[in-house]
């Protein structure tokens, strides 16, 4: 199975766990999805939101840095890449600001 497919399947499982309010399992599977350098934004978005709710800024920053790395490396004509990259960069600045306020 290709890494994209593994990431996609992990993302689907995470979504199901989150839907069923099993946040710990959802985080586990979103983390698994991004470990495969999955290039869909959903697991990165959800992890940053879940970590922000916990005020776990270190993990939020780690996930955002990973997202920026993954989306910066995509060599494609996809028109959604730059807006996503900008969104991740803005969120990273906000997370760093919040962390520094602790």
PLM regions: where:
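Structural register within alpha-helical repeat arrays
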Residues: 6, 13, 46-47, 67, ...
């Amino acid at each position: 199975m290709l890494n994209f497919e593994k990431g996609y399947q992990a993302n689907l499982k995470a979504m199901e766990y989150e839907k069923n309010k099993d946040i710990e399992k959802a985080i586990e599977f979103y983390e698994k999805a991004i470990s495969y350098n999955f290039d869909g934004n959903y697991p990165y978005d959800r992890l940053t939101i879940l970590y922000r709710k916990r005020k776990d800024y270190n993990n939020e920053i780690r996930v955002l840095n990973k997202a920026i790395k993954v989306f910066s490396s995509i060599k494609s004509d996809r028109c959604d890449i730059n807006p996503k990259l900008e969104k991740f960069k803005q969120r990273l600045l906000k997370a760093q600001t919040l962390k520094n306020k602790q």
